[in-house]
Amino acid sequence: MSEKYVVTWDMLQIHARKLAARLLPAEQWKGIIAVSRGGLVPAALLARELCIRHVDTVCISSYDHDNQREMSVLKRAEGDGEGFIVIDDLVDTGGTAQAIRDMYPKAHFVTIFAKPAGRPLVDDYIIDIPQNTWIEQPWDMGIAYIPPLVKS
């Protein structure tokens, strides 16, 4: 990946609220299925905004920080997804998204970020990201002091 897109906690919350507003009315949803791990934080934000208490997970491993590798389903939520929002932080090449679509064909699949290759696989998203860009999520970063260029 040649570019990086840094996401801050406040921007993630703003994007999640925007997404939640598009998912109204909340009563139409039975619950949320978070794609672990990237969808866990967005799922918590959606659950809060939509006052949804039923939150489950589907655990799919396809990344090791910045390298994509073979996909493995570790745990899945029951059912075909009818009445459920499935959320992940992003859709990239579409590999994970296609697996989600196959597992939950009746779910409403959303992400915060979408890259061109995976965009057709989600029902809604908030931010377009170029395909060659790596997204740095706030849960993968820390805040560190940086000394000034000129010391007093």
Curated annotation (Swiss-Prot):
<keyword id="KW-1003">Cell membrane</keyword>
<feature type="binding site">
    <location>
        <position position="89"/>
    </location>
    <ligand>
        <name>Mg(2+)</name>
    </ligand>
</feature>
<keyword id="KW-0997">Cell inner membrane</keyword>
<feature type="binding site">
    <location>
        <position position="135"/>
    </location>
    <ligand>
        <name>xanthine</name>
    </ligand>
</feature>
<dbReference type="InterPro" id="IPR000836">
    <property type="entry name" value="PRibTrfase_dom"/>
</dbReference>
<feature type="binding site">
    <location>
        <position position="69"/>
    </location>
    <ligand>
        <name>GMP</name>
    </ligand>
</feature>
<keyword id="KW-0328">Glycosyltransferase</keyword>
<comment type="subunit">
    <text>Homotetramer.</text>
</comment>
<feature type="binding site">
    <location>
        <begin position="92"/>
        <end position="96"/>
    </location>
    <ligand>
        <name>GMP</name>
    </ligand>
</feature>
<dbReference type="GO" id="GO:0000287">
    <property type="term" value="F:magnesium ion binding"/>
</dbReference>
<feature type="binding site">
    <location>
        <begin position="134"/>
        <end position="135"/>
    </location>
    <ligand>
        <name>GMP</name>
    </ligand>
</feature>
<dbReference type="Pfam" id="PF00156">
    <property type="entry name" value="Pribosyltran"/>
</dbReference>
<dbReference type="GO" id="GO:0032265">
    <property type="term" value="P:XMP salvage"/>
</dbReference>
<dbReference type="GO" id="GO:0032264">
    <property type="term" value="P:IMP salvage"/>
</dbReference>
<keyword id="KW-0808">Transferase</keyword>
<feature type="binding site">
    <location>
        <position position="135"/>
    </location>
    <ligand>
        <name>guanine</name>
    </ligand>
</feature>
<dbReference type="GO" id="GO:0052657">
    <property type="term" value="F:guanine phosphoribosyltransferase activity"/>
</dbReference>
<feature type="binding site">
    <location>
        <position position="92"/>
    </location>
    <ligand>
        <name>xanthine</name>
    </ligand>
</feature>
<comment type="pathway">
    <text>Purine metabolism; XMP biosynthesis via salvage pathway; XMP from xanthine: step 1/1.</text>
</comment>
<keyword id="KW-0660">Purine salvage</keyword>
<dbReference type="GO" id="GO:0005829">
    <property type="term" value="C:cytosol"/>
</dbReference>
<dbReference type="GO" id="GO:0006166">
    <property type="term" value="P:purine ribonucleoside salvage"/>
</dbReference>
<keyword id="KW-0472">Membrane</keyword>
<protein>
    <recommendedName>
        <fullName>Xanthine-guanine phosphoribosyltransferase</fullName>
        <ecNumber>2.4.2.-</ecNumber>
        <ecNumber>2.4.2.22</ecNumber>
    </recommendedName>
</protein>
<keyword id="KW-0460">Magnesium</keyword>
<keyword id="KW-0479">Metal-binding</keyword>
<dbReference type="GO" id="GO:0032263">
    <property type="term" value="P:GMP salvage"/>
</dbReference>
<dbReference type="InterPro" id="IPR029057">
    <property type="entry name" value="PRTase-like"/>
</dbReference>
<comment type="function">
    <text>Purine salvage pathway enzyme that catalyzes the transfer of the ribosyl-5-phosphate group from 5-phospho-alpha-D-ribose 1-diphosphate (PRPP) to the N9 position of the 6-oxopurines guanine and xanthine to form the corresponding ribonucleotides GMP (guanosine 5'-monophosphate) and XMP (xanthosine 5'-monophosphate), with the release of PPi. To a lesser extent, also acts on hypoxanthine.</text>
</comment>
<feature type="binding site">
    <location>
        <position position="92"/>
    </location>
    <ligand>
        <name>guanine</name>
    </ligand>
</feature>
<feature type="binding site">
    <location>
        <begin position="88"/>
        <end position="96"/>
    </location>
    <ligand>
        <name>5-phospho-alpha-D-ribose 1-diphosphate</name>
    </ligand>
</feature>
<feature type="binding site">
    <location>
        <position position="69"/>
    </location>
    <ligand>
        <name>5-phospho-alpha-D-ribose 1-diphosphate</name>
    </ligand>
</feature>
<dbReference type="GO" id="GO:0000310">
    <property type="term" value="F:xanthine phosphoribosyltransferase activity"/>
</dbReference>
<dbReference type="InterPro" id="IPR023747">
    <property type="entry name" value="Xanthine_Guanine_PRibTrfase"/>
</dbReference>
<dbReference type="GO" id="GO:0004422">
    <property type="term" value="F:hypoxanthine phosphoribosyltransferase activity"/>
</dbReference>
<comment type="similarity">
    <text>Belongs to the purine/pyrimidine phosphoribosyltransferase family. XGPT subfamily.</text>
</comment>
<comment type="pathway">
    <text>Purine metabolism; GMP biosynthesis via salvage pathway; GMP from guanine: step 1/1.</text>
</comment>
<feature type="binding site">
    <location>
        <begin position="37"/>
        <end position="38"/>
    </location>
    <ligand>
        <name>5-phospho-alpha-D-ribose 1-diphosphate</name>
    </ligand>
</feature>
<dbReference type="GO" id="GO:0005886">
    <property type="term" value="C:plasma membrane"/>
</dbReference>
